[in-house]
């Protein structure tokens, strides 16, 4: 060991000396003595490794307390950090999909703080059913006879098939054998549910007679799957639920539908593209309809199944139901969200998903122009900051070909180097509340459709 190396090792402080320093008192109070000591030992090992490798001390050796504070602060951050979603995708799966209404947030907090009547009947002091209150709400909204709630729509489809068609055939159009994120495929789900898939028709055209010819003594269901994350256009043919229900009645085979996104209101009244609604399919006579709680409905992640009482009873009594059931926080948030639908006049104001989807391009354009000047003054030396028209998308597999006119702030590096965009985007992801945009066509785009807290946004970006 050289004299220089020995000198470097001698500069490493003892842990007990560091702990006596006043700057460590607050760290020990905040994070605990055990964790602080554990980290200091780790840092000493790191410092010794640096000395061995490069004959120097790490830069942070000049202020151990500051480095410990920085590391423990970062470590204490939640894995689920709030972000500002300026990607242009409203229901962004990777960012948690639907924002919850304030009523839902309050309902969850109350359910977490106190025992609740999850499965307790106050009338007779007996055991209740956790789905009952929500089932009544869903029946009121959709016109169904009964309802069942599980933890997501994939679970809803699995339960629906396992409880009503295990060991039998399910007839589905070839053009509706969807795959959603995470390689969730209808054929795979059918196998897991113990069903045999019977494909009919072709990718682009399926006729009523295709279903008719497929039905046999082992057929349990005729199934429709809403292709919510893609669209087949051109020379196409598909039969709707009412026609399929008529055929099912003739052949004595029930019809079920996986609706996917599941809007409970006609979106066209808000100037948005129309999406099929569960109540329309129930009115058409479909026996079971499944849909998501955290997409267009605007609630928590949940799988909702509405339909005929006898069919729902089979789902409720199936062993998978207990494995897939929703917890009290999900049920509390979903109930509060569904109650908003009983007052449709105020829905676009109180339901964040609908509020964001219905923001007009003109309002967003004015917001962008208001923000452009201070951001251009701050970033103008390196980037051209402009207001540009753009198209938002709904996301989460909802209305895949439809776009919403919007406006964005774009940042274009004066030197044209893409690495500067990557660096800027990375810097914004390190903010206390990360700002998430997207890089496209030589620009960093911030679609402002989902920006509601301008002051917070500016405070962070102008630091």
UniProtKB/Swiss-Prot annotation:
**Which gene is the coding source of this polypeptide chain?**
selA
Reactions catalysed according to its record: L-seryl-tRNA(Sec) + selenophosphate + H(+) = L-selenocysteinyl-tRNA(Sec) + phosphate
Query: Can you supply one Gene Ontology CC term for this chain's record?
Result: cytoplasm
Protein name, UniProt field: L-seryl-tRNA(Sec) selenium transferase
Tell me yes or no: is Translocase among this UniProt entry's keywords. Answer: no
Q: Which residues carry this modification: N6-(pyridoxal phosphate)lysine?
A: 295
Name the NCBIfam families for this protein. selA
Q: What is its EC number?
A: 2.9.1.1
Family stated for the protein in its record: Belongs to the SelA family.
Q: What is its main location?
A: cytoplasm
HAMAP family membership? SelA
Q: Identify the cofactor(s).
A: pyridoxal 5'-phosphate
Pathway listed for it is: Aminoacyl-tRNA biosynthesis; selenocysteinyl-tRNA(Sec) biosynthesis; selenocysteinyl-tRNA(Sec) from L-seryl-tRNA(Sec) (bacterial route): step 1/1
What lineage, starting at the top, does this entry show?
Bacteria, Pseudomonadati, Pseudomonadota, Gammaproteobacteria, Enterobacterales
What this protein is reported to do is described as: Converts seryl-tRNA(Sec) to selenocysteinyl-tRNA(Sec) required for selenoprotein biosynthesis.
Quaternary data:
Homodecamer; pentamer of dimers. Binds only one seryl-tRNA(Sec) per dimer.
Is Cytoplasm tagged as a keyword?
A: yes
Q: Which organism is it from?
A: Escherichia coli O139:H28 (strain E24377A / ETEC)
């Amino acid at each position: 060991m050289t004299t220089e190396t020995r000198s470097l090792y001698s500069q490493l402080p003892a842990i007990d000396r560091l702990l006596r320093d006043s700057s460590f008192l607050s760290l020990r109070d905040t994070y605990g003595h055990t964790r602080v000591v554990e980290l200091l030992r780790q840092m000493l090992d790191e410092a010794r490794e640096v000395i061995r490798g490069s004959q120097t001390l790490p830069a942070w050796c000049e202020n151990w307390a500051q480095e410990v504070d920085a590391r423990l602060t970062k470590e204490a951050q939640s894995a689920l950090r709030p972000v500002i979603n300026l990607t242009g995708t409203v229901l962004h799966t990777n960012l948690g999909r639907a924002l919850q209404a304030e009523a839902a947030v309050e309902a969850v907090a109350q359910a977490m703080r106190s025992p609740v009547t999850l499965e307790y009947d106050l009338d007779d002091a007996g055991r209740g059913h956790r789905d009952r209150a929500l089932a009544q709400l869903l029946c009121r909204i959709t016109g169904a006879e009964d309802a069942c709630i599980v933890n997501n729509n994939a679970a809803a489809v699995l339960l629906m098939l396992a409880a009503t068609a295990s060991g039998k055939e399910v007839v589905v159009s070839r053009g509706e054998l969807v795959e959603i994120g995470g390689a969730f495929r209808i054929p795979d789900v059918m196998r897991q549910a113990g069903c045999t898939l019977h494909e009919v028709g072709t990718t682009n055209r399926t006729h009523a007679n295709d279903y008719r010819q497929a039905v046999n003594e082992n057929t349990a269901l005729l199934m429709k799957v809403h292709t919510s994350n893609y669209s087949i256009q051109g020379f196409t043919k598909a039969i709707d639920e009412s026609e399929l229900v008529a055929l099912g009645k003739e052949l004595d085979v029930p019809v079920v539908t996986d609706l996917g996104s599941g809007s409970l209101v006609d979106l066209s009244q808000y100037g948005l593209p129309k999406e099929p609604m569960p109540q329309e399919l129930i009115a058409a006579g479909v026996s079971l309809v499944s849909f998501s709680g955290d997409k267009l409905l605007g609630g928590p992640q949940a799988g909702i199944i509405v339909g005929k009482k006898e069919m729902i009873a089979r789902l409720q009594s199936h062993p998978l139901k207990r494995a897939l059931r929703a917890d009290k926080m999900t049920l509390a948030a979903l109930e509060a969200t569904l109650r908003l639908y009983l007052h449709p006049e105020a829905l676009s104001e109180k339901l964040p998903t609908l509020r964001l989807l219905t923001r007009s391009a003109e309002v967003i354009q004015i917001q962008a122009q208001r923000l452009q000047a201070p951001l251009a003054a701050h970033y103008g030396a390196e980037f051209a900051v402009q207001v540009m028209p753009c198209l938002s998308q709904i996301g989460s597999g909802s209305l895949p070909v439809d776009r919403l006119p919007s406006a964005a702030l774009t940042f274009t590096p004066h030197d044209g180097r893409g690495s500067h965009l990557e660096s800027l985007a990375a810097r914004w992801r390190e903010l206390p509340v990360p700002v998430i945009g997207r890089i496209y066509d030589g620009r960093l785009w911030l679609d402002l459709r989902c920006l509601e807290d301008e002051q917070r946004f500016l405070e962070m970006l102008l630091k």
